[in-house]
From Swiss-Prot:
Species for this entry: Clostridium perfringens (strain 13 / Type A)
Family from the record: Belongs to the universal ribosomal protein uS4 family.
Name recorded for this polypeptide: Small ribosomal subunit protein uS4B
One Pfam entry name: S4
Annotated GO CC locations: small ribosomal subunit
Length: 197
């Protein structure tokens, strides 16, 4: 499976965005000039924003382009539709539900088959959740202390479009998120403009 490679904290500095999920990522990235600090052309600004969003969700270029095509073909605003597609990926929702400390860790957990979606084992990080879908940590995976601690420590800090059942190690994708509820600082309209040319 293709992966986004490269020093993670260096990538944070280069893109001017915490794309690894670590709470101290930007501090550990150190000082230096990011692309976001440099004077860029309109095209350069749009390209940077696309790279920031792609890196945040850990999506490869080809798959990201497919998501963009789907967003443009939807009945919604392309930028918000794109964010909704990315946000509904299983690896991201595992992260939002508090099972993992980063999207990267969530992707590994999904790959290793630690979750059931509506009672069925799913090990595809790009699997898209629908509203009302339930994600449960498998019984045998609850023996891993890190997974249990991640979930319990995140109780009360989940996003508004997710609910959790602590005793059942369950997260539910309850509703479509509003744009302002998605916790990422990105100007999706710049990405729409990039692909509109």
């Amino acid at each position: 499976m293709a992966k986004m490679m490269g020093p993670r904290f260096k990538m944070c500095r280069r893109l001017g965005l915490n794309v690894v999920g670590h709470p101290k990522a930007m501090k550990r990235a150190g000082r230096g000039t990011s692309r976001a600090d440099k004077k860029l052309s309109d095209y350069g600004i749009q390209l940077l924003e696309k790279q920031r969003l792609r890196a945040y969700y850990g999506v490869m270029e080809r798959q990201f382009t497919r998501y963009v095509d789907q967003a443009f073909n939807s009945k919604e605003q392309p930028g918000e539709a794109l964010l909704m597609i990315l946000e509904s990926r299983l690896d991201n929702m595992v992260y939002r539900m508090g099972f993992a400390s980063s999207i990267r860790q969530a992707r590994q957990m999904v790959n290793h088959g630690h979750f059931l979606v509506n009672g069925k084992k799913v090990n595809i990080p790009s699997f898209r959740l629908n509203i009302g879908d339930e994600v449960v940590l498998r019984e045998k995976s609850r023996k891993t202390e890190m997974f249990v601690n991640n979930f319990k420590d995140s109780i009360g800090s989940e996003v508004p479009y997710v609910s959790k059942e602590e005793d059942n190690f369950k997260g539910i994708f309850t509703r479509k998120p509003k744009r302002e509820e998605i916790p990422i600082t990105i100007q999706e309209q710049l990405i729409v403009e990039f692909y509109s040319k």
